[in-house]
């Protein structure tokens, strides 16, 4: 792999929001998701209220309870300059919950999966 190719892969891996990709195409999206997947970064934002999760078919430390508590703490902290956590299903669930609490409007989280096991696993993470 040459230096330019390595830089492209590193740049795609660093993209946390698919809406921020330059030259948006199917190939760019798949390449970005692939690079993130290969580094065990399985969650990627799509704008401010959507998330893509690629099932790694293995344990990923980012789904641990300790990580869940970090995301919950992100919303309890009142620091205006706090760094935002990387995209995660815990973050999406927190956003929906706290938006519901602030606005008293119902919220929905839609799940789509080709695998029932993946669907159930993400559902369990959301329910935590």
Predicted feature residues:
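N-terminal entry segment of cytoskeletal motor ATPase domains
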Residues: 1-112, 117-120, 128
């Amino acid at each position: 792999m040459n230096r330019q190719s390595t830089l492209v892969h590193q740049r795609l891996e660093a993209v946390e929001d698919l809406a921020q990709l330059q030259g948006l195409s199917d190939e760019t999206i798949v390449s970005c998701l692939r690079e993130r997947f290969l580094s065990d970064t399985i969650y990627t934002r799509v704008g401010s209220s959507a998330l893509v999760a690629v099932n790694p078919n293995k344990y990923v430390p980012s789904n641990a309870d300790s990580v869940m508590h970090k995301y919950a703490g992100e919303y309890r902290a009142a620091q205006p300059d706090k760094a935002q956590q990387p995209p995660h299903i815990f973050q999406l669930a927190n956003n929906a919950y706290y938006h519901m609490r602030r606005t008293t409007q119902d919220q929905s989280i839609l799940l789509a999966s080709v695998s029932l096991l993946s669907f159930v696993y993400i559902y369990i993470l959301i329910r935590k």
